């Protein structure tokens, strides 16, 4: 990643009303993006958003900036991030823009872009947009101004796309599913997809009011889903995050099934069906149990840096078609171009239907290792704790004790002065003790 002023690993994000998530900045961003992206002749930009109240304000600002650059905006209304990627491809638009802060609270928001082929923008294009931001806005002639229109069938188009990734010969008619849409962008999509495929659906987190997105619901907080699955005696639960690019599941016993387990199920099923090409990509945080389970199946496994952007880069580098983060970003390049919670969830449901197995049983081939994470705050500017000899010494001792049946990972937070200490192994008590021993060494620096 180069040093960029505004763009992070997943677009531009922050608290609404604080720079850069302000109406004036976003208007200029729309103009700058329009100047850079007007390359392919369609002069159309798809704009989607999640259910945050600030989405309307930022949508208007973007549209004004794009119009000034001579590009027309096509609004989808509340729509999952992967749906915008899909619609950008099918409309052959210059680009797609998503107004969302994903799993963050309602008072945050962000802007991220998709290129004409439905993938994240290359670094060079983001850098060109930033360079354009330094210039004064110049408006095209009145006759060339962009227009605004709405894609009235956006939801229906995406629902049909999702359903098409589920095998025609299978049905969900025997499954009772609780779906939690985080009061976010999937609220009018996911329940309909599942119902149209035959499932008995109980929907929660499907009443967005602009300020309740991700609030004690969704992929980042599955407690409400776990309780409802047990209360309804459902076969499983499926949770999405606010913009629908993550999925976490819950089995009939209320156990959480994370992105690592979801990828294991999909990869194993792909192998059984003779459809898996190459291996699977996880991250530095992926559970060691995933790596060992895939190894037993003869499926190669590689780790990327944390972040779906880096997972995709590693997949492209190796020519592999499946990758995931344990947080629930699952990328299936045979189906789509980006992480898609609904599509990933459907592949797990297909494995359940095809094999007549419960979600719990599908997970049984993978033993999750206890993974303890301790965050240690340090004083910024006081040197790098990870380079201190005492920290290195304790880390080496722990690694030697764990041997090949465990891992230690120390990494800095990208957003605040925190060291994240992760220790993983077979014995939870031992792993906890080791994690706190390393954390104490970091604190003592």
Curated annotation (Swiss-Prot):
GO terms for cellular component: cytosol. The keyword Ubl conjugation does not apply. Its cofactor is Mg(2+). GO terms for biological process: carbohydrate metabolic process; peptidoglycan biosynthetic process; UDP-N-acetylglucosamine biosynthetic process. The active site is at 102 (phosphoserine intermediate). Binds 1 Mg(2+) ion per subunit. It catalyses: alpha-D-glucosamine 1-phosphate = D-glucosamine 6-phosphate. Its EC number is 5.4.2.10. Pfam families: PGM_PMM_I, PGM_PMM_II, PGM_PMM_III, PGM_PMM_IV. The modification Phosphoserine is found at residue 102. SUPFAM superfamilies: Phosphoglucomutase, C-terminal domain, Phosphoglucomutase, first 3 domains. PROSITE patterns: PGM_PMM. Keywords: Isomerase, Magnesium, Metal-binding, Phosphoprotein. Activated by phosphorylation. GO terms for molecular function: magnesium ion binding; phosphoglucosamine mutase activity; phosphomannomutase activity. InterPro entries: A-D-PHexomutase_a/b/a-I (IPR005844), A-D-PHexomutase_a/b/a-I/II/III (IPR016055), A-D-PHexomutase_a/b/a-II (IPR005845), A-D-PHexomutase_a/b/a-III (IPR005846), A-D-PHexomutase_C (IPR005843), A-D-PHexomutase_C_sf (IPR036900), A-D-PHexomutase_CS (IPR016066), Alpha-D-phosphohexomutase_SF (IPR005841). It comes from the Bacteria. Mg(2+) binds at residues 102, 241, 243, 245. The keyword Magnesium applies. Catalyzes the conversion of glucosamine-6-phosphate to glucosamine-1-phosphate. PANTHER family: PHOSPHOGLUCOMUTASE (ALPHA-D-GLUCOSE-1,6-BISPHOSPHATE-DEPENDENT), PHOSPHOHEXOSE MUTASE. Belongs to the phosphohexose mutase family. This is Phosphoglucosamine mutase. It comes from Escherichia fergusonii (strain ATCC 35469 / DSM 13698 / CCUG 18766 / IAM 14443 / JCM 21226 / LMG 7866 / NBRC 102419 / NCTC 12128 / CDC 0568-73). The gene is glmM.
